[in-house]
Swiss-Prot record:
This is Photosystem II D2 protein. InterPro entries: D1/D2, Photo_II_D1/D2_sf, Photo_RC_L/M, Photo_RC_L/M_CS, PSII_PsbD/D2. Its EC number is 1.10.3.9. The D1/D2 heterodimer binds P680, chlorophylls that are the primary electron donor of PSII, and subsequent electron acceptors. It shares a non-heme iron and each subunit binds pheophytin, quinone, additional chlorophylls, carotenoids and lipids. There is also a Cl(-1) ion associated with D1 and D2, which is required for oxygen evolution. The PSII complex binds additional chlorophylls, carotenoids and specific lipids. The modification N-acetylthreonine is found at T2. Chlorophyll a ChlzD2 binds at H118. It comes from Phaseolus vulgaris. GO terms for cellular component: chloroplast thylakoid membrane; photosystem II. The lineage of its organism: Eukaryota, Viridiplantae, Streptophyta, Embryophyta, Tracheophyta. A plastoquinone binds at H215, F262. It is a multi-pass membrane protein. Belongs to the reaction center PufL/M/PsbA/D family. It is an enzyme of class 1 (oxidoreductase).
Length: 353
């Protein structure tokens, strides 16, 4: 018996093939299948943010002015979170809260959920775009893997944290000063700076900045003299096939400086990928812990001794008192719907005050 093996070919293209040909066509701006998610979501997220910061007040949700129309500037304008009473409602325009009224929807904070959800899916679409392009040109997918770090931070801070709390109200509003307020809130209510996951995140981000600076400077230092131009950009032909810097020279230099150095480019560049991405993932995990109100380090023995001994105080006990002050002041300011009043005699005073 003879078996003929051959590649099956379709006589005519179906709708999927036609779509695939159009989406993945070589053009100035690649679209791709990921673009069906990325471009609409990015458009709506940015459009919602510009609309909110320009026109929409936060008076009904936070008792604040938050738009250019009310006199805010770029640093103080924001798309603010919905009121605490709305809990975790998706605040759909056609939902029971707004009932199709666009003005009412904006007043209730519907733009925040709109921007947050479209922003999250837009970021995921951008990561899928990197996967798709990498596969098209037969590259490894490390760019997309690296971009998972920012996505993890965004999703944990803007979605998972408020889901663990009483409502979207406790998520960050989309604005510069609003993010600063959220950072102060995290410190006062969660002692975030003493959280080991935050420490790993800081080490990752600052360590990555250091590695980036060292790497860029080292490459510039060991460039081959390939031309007589006045600067790096004029002296080199960007299409030349050979390397433009000496890994051997760089290795000898850092071996003398530190006693150790990267021996090959793969390990060096993997380390530059690993440090920031791991840091971002660790801080995202820490925020998930805070969503569940998990505590980090509590040095109770120092707190007890500071309470008993007027002359004993550490930077830790000082910070604990500062956190109490943030909570006492911030709760009344930040949650006006609770009508909280703290008389001066209950506000914290350290031993040194």
């Amino acid at each position: 018996m003879t078996i003929a093996l051959g590649k099956f070919t379709k006589d005519e293209k179906d709708l999927f093939d036609i779509m695939d040909d159009w989406l993945r066509r070589d053009r100035f701006v690649f679209v791709g299948w990921s673009g069906l998610l990325l471009f609409p979501c990015a458009y709506f997220a940015l459009g919602g943010w510009f609309t909110g910061t320009t026109f929409v007040t936060s008076w009904y949700t936070h008792g604040l002015a938050s738009s250019y129309l009310e006199g805010c500037n770029f640093l103080t304008a924001a798309v603010s979170t919905p009121a605490n009473s709305l809990s975790h409602s998706l605040l759909l325009l056609w939902g029971p809260e707004a009932q199709g009224d666009f003005t009412r929807w904006c007043q209730l904070g519907g733009l925040w959920t709109f921007v947050a959800l479209h922003g999250a899916f837009g970021l995921i679409g951008f990561m899928l775009r990197q996967f798709e392009l990498a596969r098209s040109v037969q590259l490894r997918p490390y760019n997309a893997i690296a971009f998972s770090g920012p996505i993890a931070v965004f999703v944990s801070v803007f979605l998972i944290y408020p889901l663990g709390q009483s409502g979207w109200f406790f998520a960050p509003s989309f604005g510069v000063a609003a993010i600063f307020r959220f950072i102060l809130f995290f410190q006062g209510f969660h002692n975030w700076t003493l959280n080991p996951f935050h420490m790993m995140g800081v080490a990752g981000v600052l360590g990555a900045a250091l590695l980036c600076a060292i790497h860029g400077a080292t490459v510039e230092n060991t460039l081959f003299e390939d031309g007589d131009g006045a600067n790096t950009f004029r002296a080199f032909n960007p299409t030349q096939a050979e390397e433009t810097y000496s890994m051997v020279t760089a290795n000898r230099f850092w071996s003398q400086i530190f006693g150790v150095a990267f021996s090959n480019k793969r390990w060096l560049h993997f380390f530059m990928l690993f440090v920031p991405v791991t840091g971002l993932w660790m801080s995202a995990l820490g925020v998930v812990g805070l969503a569940l109100n998990l505590r980090a380090y509590d040095f109770v023995s120092q707190e007890i001794r500071a309470a008993e001994d007027p002359e004993f105080e550490t930077f830790y006990t000082k910070n604990i008192l500062l956190n109490e002050g943030i909570r006492a002041w911030m709760a009344a300011q930040d949650q006006p719907h609770e009508n909280l009043i703290f008389p001066e005699e209950v506000l914290p005073r350290g031993n040194a005050l």
